[in-house]
Amino acid sequence: MTVQDYLLKFRKISSLESLEKLFDHLNYTLTDDMDIVNMYRAADHRRAELVSGGRLFDVGQVPQSVWRYVQ
């Protein structure tokens, strides 16, 4: 799956706690290295969207000022 595919899956989730549960599940079940990298990128992107108040950004377009709030 691509980063966009994972991001669309993660956008169905509106809380950081639920996002972490899905992230842990996928991290445990995925075996392909490229899928894992794409999933990590999408999860980080969704974390940034959630801490910015739910504002949606295109892949790779999250402002640098938002990243300081992502844990």
UniProtKB/Swiss-Prot annotation:
Residues carrying the site annotation Interacts with H-NS: 44
Domain of life according to the entry: Bacteria
Residues spanning the membrane: none
Pfam family, one: HHA
Keyword terms: DNA-binding, Transcription, Transcription regulation
GO-annotated molecular function: DNA binding
Keyword NAD on entry: no
Known partners and oligomeric status: Forms complexes with both H-NS and StpA.
Primary role: Binds to H-NS and modified the range of genes it silences; H-NS alonge silences core gene while the H-NS-Hha complex (and presumably also H-NS-YdgT) silences genes acquired by horizontal gene transfer. Plays a role silencing virulence factors in the absence of factors that induce pathogenicity. The complex formed with H-NS binds to the specific 26-bp cnb site in the origin of replication oriC.
Family membership: Belongs to the Hha/YmoA/Cnu family.
Name listed for the protein in its UniProt record: Transcription modulator YdgT
Native source species: Salmonella choleraesuis (strain SC-B67)
